[in-house]
């Protein structure tokens, strides 16, 4: 709400945040991991941690792009000329701002107080209670503004940041406007700023806004179903879990926040997808642990309630609908609605609940074995499509055999007289002609 350039409306006036009080602000350089959620102040990085991420060992940890400046602040200032601030409520002049936001979550293994896994080797699923997790809520700048594309926690996005004067905190929009790029009036300073008459940009500080807080949390592994793990599967399952919480505990869960988290798999290559539920009350209320401590049956009951509600929803009588606001569309993150569907939610829940459900206690769900070499449903579909090409359109016979390739599960594919190795999620580097280590 208090980000630079955001607008406030009251008493038929519109004012825009154009300054941060630097007396009540602090900025510090952090290094971000491109693959996992880990971040660390530059000054706190030890010598042996400079080349690879201390958490996931990512080789991109030391890239210059992973070093960014974060700013925490307590007060902003909005100044607008009287005439320019006046608006007419009869006209819809409200123009909302959208920002590149990302929540990074870190916790120690010892913080996992209780963890359960489903005793189905072919269906990896489980959940755990985390007594203390550290959250970093970061605003990387306005959407659609130009800036560098940076990968953080497996998400590659344009992150323009905010440019401000490092002394007076005035917002500098000059860099984002081609029309006034050379105009002297483009520089913005407070009247008493020592850089007011500066002819260069030495006073510019490019920052990302952040806040840190700690709370208790619950983490649920998204099931690796027969359909794989795709955005529709993830978002539909989040919607089902949120619905299950509401049905099980009523309106007493309004302070809980639901989000998606994906991390690199430290057991095998690929990524793991989780639903993260955290208490919006800093420090936590003890509510999550109270709800699901001691037994996994509460989670089972929650899943059953969600399944029964969705399958009995009246929208099943309307073939053109794949969900409604009485079932999965109650999901709060409206920007993900396109990926939420009744059929996807039912497919996941049905696989979890079919046959007898047995639970087993584990140290953490991070240890649950999954076939993470197939990092997405798209990769699985690609392999399935290869098999279906046999003897079609003049192609020779195609045979695929599961095999261990370079120490992990892969495939040998025979196409006529030719034979190829398929190694999922292979790391490419200089030996393969790739300058920056990455996975295709």
Can you annotate each of these PLM segments?
Residues 23-51:
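Short peripheral tails and domain-boundary helices/loops at the edges of structured domains
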Residues 7, 30, 219, 402-403, ...:
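Residue-level detector of beta-strand face positions
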Residues 1-12, 19, 24, 52-375:
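Extended, highly charged accessory segments
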Residues 8, 439-440:
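Metal-dependent nuclease catalytic cores in nucleic-acid-processing enzymes
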Residues 41, 60-65, 251-260, 387-403:
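Short secondary-structure junctions
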Residues 58, 426-427, 440:
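Short beta-alpha junction loops
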Residues 379-430, 434-436:
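Active-site metal-binding core of divalent-cation-utilizing nuclease and nuclease-like domains
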